[in-house]
């Protein structure tokens, strides 16, 4: 019998999370000093998770501002020391998490997601060598649920978007592969974590 993994969904746009103020109090008290928002609840969910999956559209070459607010508060998970050569990041506790980054963007060039991937690469490394980052980028995605559209629906959409009709067939197959990659990643991580 297969076990089911427990999953908590957090919608960044609905979470009440105050912007990081850069006060650096977290360097002294080993947690974020900001009170009165959803961070304490989110923090516990993050710390108790084996897998952290982040999904975001790429808007103007970066992730959404609500998600960025949450990521900025990750600063409180580590001590940051300024040195003559740069910054040393030391997590308050050992992290061994799988970070999953699922990005969708209108651009047909996956390289346009690089700034977001670079941010998550930095974050997973700063939180310790026990972490891993798994990234999947969907390209030429302009509307909600486009990745699951039929080939005919894609053709109709592409006419409205003034995209060449032959791209619909190419993108339909690419989207099927993308969805299968997401499924395979989820299944693989669930198996690694005993679900």
Task: For the regions a language model picked out, list residue spans one by one.
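Short, catalytically relevant binding-site loops at active-site mouths
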Residues: 59-61, 107-109, 141-142
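A short secondary-structure junction signal
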Residues: 65, 111-115, 146-147
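Short, glycine-/small-residue-rich phosphate/pyrophosphate-handling segment
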Residues: 81-134
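N-terminal beta1-alpha1-beta2 submodule of the flavodoxin-like/Rossmannoid cofactor-binding fold
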Residues: 1-79, 83-86, 155-195
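Beta-strand-loop-alpha "switch" segments that mediate conformational coupling across diverse proteins
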Residues: 133-145
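Conserved beta-strand scaffold positions in the cores of enzyme catalytic domains, especially
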Residues: 7-9, 132-135
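C-terminal beta-strand edge segments of enzyme domains
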Residues: 144-147, 174
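Short, surface-exposed amphipathic charged segments that create phosphate/polyanion-binding patches used
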Residues: 148-156
